[in-house]
Amino acid sequence: YNQVLKGMKAYVNAKGDEHSEEFLKQFKYSPMSINNAFNSYLEKRNNYESLVSKEESEKFLAANAKKDGVKVTESGLQYEIIEQGGEVMPTLSDTLYVKYKGTLIDGTVFDQTAEDGEPISFPLGGVIKGWQEGLQLIGEGGKIKLYIPADLAYGERGNQGIKPNSALVFDVELVKVGKASEEK
């Protein structure tokens, strides 16, 4: 698309004002109608990908819920506690220090902390709902595998490399809980 636009602009610069009637008569389709058609195509493609992703995610979660060791909450979050962790339990107002790996349901890694690196920190109340709910199930030092439905992740909008309506899988180690009362 960018190459087509670049070519059209070069042609415009060589032939005159792109808004003049004389210039527009040279084209079977106006640049505006081409742009509108392209945007319509993108919207239809995104809607199709969203529907396919939703169907695949629902199928994955339905099969996954039947696996031994997988528990399902009322919200639809699925999880496996690998290690329960200690007595210090996180709340939404706490800052958590975690190591994690996030994958799509096909196993494609879309984000992770460095394997030998430092954990990242974030306020629990500021992350996706699947993490908010799931990480409150383990204590400091615990490990959990989260299978997050799209509505508890990025929903219909998707996010950087994650298609709309995608279920996500996370392996998370809760390294430390920074209690809100201790941070003030």
Where are these regions (language model features)?
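Cross-family detector of peptidyl-prolyl cis-trans isomerase
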Residues: 1-184
